[in-house]
Amino acid sequence: MVLTRRQIINGALSIGATSLGGCVFVRPITAFCPDDPRISNPNSPLTIDVHGHVFNGSDIQIERYITLVRARQTPALKDLGEILQEVGWEVAPSGAQEISVLRQVNQRLSAGCGPGEFERLHIAHRNEKYLAGRSALNEALTRVESRRRPAFRSTYGGNAVANAIRSLPTSYPEYHHWQLRRAYRAVGTDAVNAAVAFVMRQFQYRYVNVFDFLTEYSSGSARKIDLLICHCLDFDWPLALGKPTMTPIADQIDVMEQISILTGGRVHCYAPFDPMKQVAYDLGYSTESPESLVQKAILSQGFVGIKIYPPMGFAPAGNAHMKPGFWNRKWLPAPMHRPDFGRRLDDVLARLYSWCVANGVPIMAHTSPSEGPCSDFENLTASDYWWAVPGGLTVNFGHFGDTEIAPDNLSRALAYWKLMGRSGSHGANFYADAAYLTEALKEPVKLTEALRRLFQMAQGKTSPALAQRLMYGSDWEMLVIEGSASESYLSNFEQIFSNLDRDASLGAQGKLSARFFGINAANYLSLRAGSAARARLDAFYAARGVPTPQWAQKVNALPPLVA
């Protein structure tokens, strides 16, 4: 739909109460409108990215994440963690600051949207926060070096981290060009440079991250991202001893509601559910109920699903059977050391699953044995734990069990495929995504053959063909850690599936690429007209004055559902 000048002028902010206090609903900003050819094509095939992130450093415990999680893989990052402890994260926009900026942007554009006007604002905000982040990192490094000189640079990691920070260019355009010249790899100095690039993302406005993603992934790709599903994260209890982030989860939800409106429905979100925090709330140790937050987000704020993160320290089911003392870890708060903690985790997860089944709400779970603070917790991503969840639950197995899928490494993916059932059986609504499959960046030919073999093997009498359940996902902005090559993730997958489309033996019941990039996600998210999920979104758009998004028009044109 092409928006008129009247719709542009009527896009001024309308007042609405949120937990941020006095915040507003943001009408779609039409200078970067839903039919902008840079990010949109009404004639391109439906493309949905089911797995993305646009958070910033006020939304997650970035220092704890780098120190407790990423440094387990790359020990040199412990030195980066020390610097991040010195950073004043008030530089990263809070939820209230982001809403204020969105109001300013809308005010600037309410009298009319001249050519490139939104782009000028977007670029100015991006450069402002890039410079602020660069300054914050350099100042923090100076303090650490002064305190530990010359010890800090005497180690390989300290020297690599210091060089990466001191080398940051003086403007964002120079920085982006500098990134494109580098080819990061997940080893040594390159891993440090990539981690610093990820940290620089954490100083940005969330709306800047959104439009950077949309423009980067649309460049050089025949497909355009019609719908991006972003996932909020809640690591307050698993990583931060119960201390909330600078922008609390409730405020993050409010901000992402506004961004859904800002983008004209091109971006929707999953609310985070941490069962550890829910147990803490039930016991009186936390004032915030994840259950209440996710239900409000789904029913009235345009959110479309719920995100859980097992490698932070819980299985999807069966926690009561863990060995005694399993949660007695030094980084976990004392209330989690109690002997009945596993049973309580199972209880709150069972309540969540029942509500999701009753309301037609999908779940996404991180299923790769990675991104946890210890190996014991990462092992909780094993597929066997999912046999005990309710059979009617709708689930996306994020990363399809492993981010390293290769022809000789298919066992975890096949184990997750075996969980998927046909209509009427357990797992009838189980899916998986291809987010952060690093071989797509490093060895796309190798990944093509791995996926071909996987599709050929994953066809059975009791399980549906994998071709009908695997979905496209990127895991941007986490993928930024892989370096500048991450910008080619979508285009590389386009080429991979262009090759696979020629093989009629893979079980797609139609064009495999159409399934992978759009149809399977539309089925998983229940986006077709008449579903409870679609009804919630249609009501959300009507209440906020958002025209029918392009993704909805494309979904409406899909042939009847083929399971």
Which residues does each PLM region occupy?
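N-terminal export signals
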Residues: 1-2, 7-27
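An N-terminally biased module of ancient metal coordination in phosphate/nucleic-acid-related enzymes
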Residues: 8-9, 24-251
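H/E-rich (His + Asp/Glu) clusters that bind or coordinate divalent metals
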Residues: 28-34, 394-563
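Histidine-centered catalytic micro-motifs
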Residues: 47-57, 364-367, 397-400
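Active-site neighborhood of phospho(di)ester-bond hydrolases with catalytic His/Asp-centered motifs
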Residues: 48-50, 231, 270-272, 307, ...
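Distinct, well-ordered alpha-helical segments
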Residues: 246, 280-297, 318-321, 373-389, ...
